[in-house]
Amino acid sequence: PVKKVFTSRWNSDQFGMRGKILEADFAQLEFRVAALLSQDKVAMQEVSTGFDVHSYTAQIISEAGQPTTRQEAKAHTFAPLYGATGYGRTKAEAEYYTHFMDKYKGIAKWHKKLGDEAINLGRIKIPSGRQYAFPDVERRRSGTPTHFTMIKNYPVQGFATGDIVPIVLLEIEKRLDQKDLKSMLVNTVHDSVVLDVHPLEEKDVLGIIKDVNDNLKKIIEDYYDIDVNVPMLLESKIGDNWLDVKDVV
């Protein structure tokens, strides 16, 4: 696997230990963002209680006649957030997509609101101020707008990886600078942040990630002047290379 070749630049034995690769990854960021933006009560409750949504997805598809593992179910769990439907899927899988909108009525209602906004104003706007233009959007005979997949997808992806992840990067970088650390940010992939950790700074860097995680609500609220009533979670993994990172307890 390619990730195994990514190791710390501080890989000598000068200090009796080697540098580490740390990956700080948001837990179910898009689902949490969808819960926040839609204020769906069921989704908010599941986020708050740590409900295992992937196992639930597997259960729905399996009960519809297609035995499915939790890992296999992951491909479907959040797909409706991005505009995916049951079209072109097996009958059992399609059952889950219908079930999703029945279960998360607040998200379904929010999707409709976004569609109406796009038709009436030619654009949609999210709480950060980010806007997406749809100048040629029209209402189909079915009542749904054209470009509906993008209309449903952009707010979730935009607020999650376009608005939240960048400010977290800034907060991590600011704290690294304040402590005058050699450790540095080296990469981001979707909703995860990768750092190269100096061998003498592991405790400091883990402390920074914990501090950012503990203050995520305030960080987002201060940047975008919104009320964040859905918990966000930044989890850390660390190891000798990017592939072999382990959860930080």
Residue ranges of predicted features:
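Conserved catalytic core of nucleotide polymerization and phosphodiester-bond processing enzymes
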Residues: P1-V249
